[in-house]
């Protein structure tokens, strides 16, 4: 029986909205403080975003934005924004094992896949299980001229959790790793910071110094019911929580 397609962008990391790593801190912002690049994209969506209504509600969105993150930029984000690091690390590990059984995620404290039922169908594990051999190949070959690409998703695939990421590309330039990702749709409050952390964890498994991670955001958006919460976050409210839109 076909599974109902549900977009991953709001659902992917509901734990992010309720959990933060004990090692993460929130940096309050003042007129003199420079926002990290993730918070800058939130500010840009608030300031310049257009309005649209879809089946899940009203959003403020921007098209074809780009985040280019150096190791220093990543550190700024991880130190200045709460991320459920342990759970996201466990989740990526299960993805890369190709684990489709939702119960296995519950066993490590991850319950945001429960709505999918017992099995993840043509979702992240289906594609991320290709990552370990790809990483091994990169580490073995280390070819500057080779583009190593992991494709995610298929337009017509039957799924109960469509990946937001469409591809992740690994390139080597002057002995340094350059990671590029294309994200077809990105919930800026819930999915985006978690995707940034997942990409960082992938990069750490490659035996090369990281030069940059670039995210190409085809559609990055904030749901209307999270706009005020986003403003509070940017004002330094460390207790802000975001609504899940499904």
Model-found features: residue ranges?
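Targeting/processing segments of secretory and organellar proteins
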Residues: 1-3, 10
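Terminal, non-catalytic protein-protein interaction segments that mediate quaternary/complex assembly
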Residues: 9-246
